Amino acid sequence: MKKLLLIAAASTALLTSGLSFADCDMNSSVDSSTNSSMSSSVENQWYLKLNAGGVIFNKTKPKGADFKLNNIKSNIKSNTGFTGEIGAGYYIMDNLRTDLTIGTVASSHLKKSKTYPDGNSFSVKNKPTIVSVLLNGYVDFVDLSMFKVFAGAGVGAAFVKEKIHSKDIKGGVTDTFNGTTKNKTNFAYQLSLGTSFEVAQGVKAELVYSWRDYGKTKNTTKTINGDKVKFGGTHYKGHNLMAGLRFDM
């Protein structure tokens, strides 16, 4: 969460400096037509967007028999991973727009470890690979010419799989397990709240928080030395914070 706050602070500073620059540029201009073009209508106009930032997934209960055998009952926790998306959209009205985005999650993992009084230990690490395709809609509910606040929602599909690595140390003997689930296609959705402002004619910077649910990975069974090991079924959903640019066409 601290990393997300740092991302938010840096993004806000960047956006504020851009707004100050745009404001100074407008004040120094003697051509009133420049001011009108900066806040001109964008209805029936296309745009491209690029966003990047951080993601923290919700804590989730561990799956599989190994967790029960090792008495792992608490949730496995997420680090702050990278998330980004690109998309193309259309302004239906001045305050209403829609877009189609392709997003990804990288450098993210869920991790848990436990050490026992006798020196034995158990650890697990889940690393997801997520690609999403979402159709989104946004409404500007605060419109101060160059500065806007908007809310949005989107639905689509997420392609989710994960790698799982566990290590079990008992009596000086180390057992490791590595497994990869098959790709699974899930229903995905997002709910978002953000701000944007125009830093140049046809270029808008935005800072967006979103809650995203990508669904669960595929439940998988793998036979190792005659034993069946079950893993997968991890639910990936959580908080996203991204900054980016929107280019009007």
Swiss-Prot record:
InterPro entries: OMP/PagP_b-brl, OMP_b-brl
Entry keyword set: Signal
Family annotation (Gene3D superfamilies): 2.40.160.20
Pfam family, one: OMP_b-brl
Signal peptide residue numbers: 1-22
Protein's job: Adheres to biotinylated epithelial (Vero cell) proteins.
Protein name: Putative adhesin RC1281
Organism whose genome encodes this protein: Rickettsia conorii (strain ATCC VR-613 / Malish 7)
